[in-house]
Swiss-Prot record:
Residues 13-48, 45-79 form the EF-hand domain. This is Protein S100-G. The modification N-acetylserine is found at S2. Keywords: Acetylation, Calcium, Metal-binding, Phosphoprotein, Repeat, Vitamin D. GO terms for molecular function: calcium ion binding; calcium-dependent protein binding; transition metal ion binding; vitamin D binding. Ca(2+) 1 binds at Q26, E31. The modification N-acetylalanine is found at A3. It comes from Sus scrofa (Pig). GO terms for cellular component: cytoplasm. Ca(2+) 2 binds at D58, N60, D62, E64, E69. Disulfide bonds: none annotated. The modification Phosphoserine is found at S42.
Length: 79
């Protein structure tokens, strides 16, 4: 997936993965892993781990990633 998607496309992709388990408006760590592996496969190559990325994105510390928190990742990728 290119980070150059419209906001509606990004929201749709987020919701597709978030709806797999638990809260359909939040990504669990497993859902985030599935999304990254399918949509951003090169993101976790190198020293960065899923745990590092999840901790960085989960700004409020609730153990899930909201769409707003996910947008931080998209912005970083598109730079």
């Amino acid at each position: 997936m290119s980070a150059q998607k419209s906001p509606a496309e990004l929201k749709s992709i987020f919701e597709k993965y978030a709806a797999k388990e638990g809260d359909p408006n939040q990504l669990s760590k497993e859902e985030l892993k599935q999304l990254i592996q399918a949509e951003f496969p090169s993101l976790l190559k190198g020293p960065r781990t899923l745990d590092d990325l999840f901790q960085e994105l989960d700004k409020n510390g609730d153990g899930e990633v909201s769409f707003e928190e996910f947008q931080v990742l998209v912005k970083k990728i598109s730079q």
